[in-house]
Amino acid sequence: MQALDVLLNRVSVPRLIEPAPTQAQREVLFGAAMRAPDHGHLQPWRFLTVEGAAREQMGELLAEAAKLQDAEVTEAAIDKARNGPLRAPLVVVVIARVQDHVKYPKSEQLLAAGCAAHGILLAAYAQGIGAVWRTGDLAYSPHVAKGLGLAEGEEVIAFLYLGTPLKEPRVAEKVDLAQFVCAWPGKA
């Protein structure tokens, strides 16, 4: 698959089934992530892979976080949190490892980690792997951070769900670029 085809046609694939990406495919996914633009070459990211029974444990962690976040949370919302990680055979947790740095601010490091996540999504599409970015507010819970073993200065920025597409992915819609791009006229 050509690079421009991947860049112009990647879409989210929300319905995923087994099998999960193979080890060889994962090496490509994470290799692509490592090519993310990174001012200062800090590599301010790391990844956790969650699969098999660990997905159920992650679901319990998210359900606990939902209860802690809102004392009046509904059972439906708790169940949704609990079942979230079961929606794909592989969940990749993308973690930003932000460092105090005089030259490279936190915002740039978070953007670099986001680019690493995007690299995984692009590499997934290029290999025919279904993928979708499904993070949600529970990802930012201190309870989830602790349960996932995050260190100080680390934060979850993405839950990427990966697997085999249940059906043929939709075709990317054309975008009116004029709605997003314009020339700056400079000062008058």
PLM-predicted stretches and their roles:
Residues 33, 92, 98-147:
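Small-aliphatic-rich amphipathic alpha-helix that forms the alpha element of a beta-alpha
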Residues 67, 86-99:
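Acidic-glycine-rich active-site phosphate/pyrophosphate-binding loop
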Residues 3-12, 156-188:
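C-terminal helix-cap and adjacent tail motif
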Residues 144-157:
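Short, electropositive alpha-helical surface patch
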Residues 1-87, 186-188:
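N-terminal amphipathic, basic helical "cap/leader" segment at the start of enzyme domains
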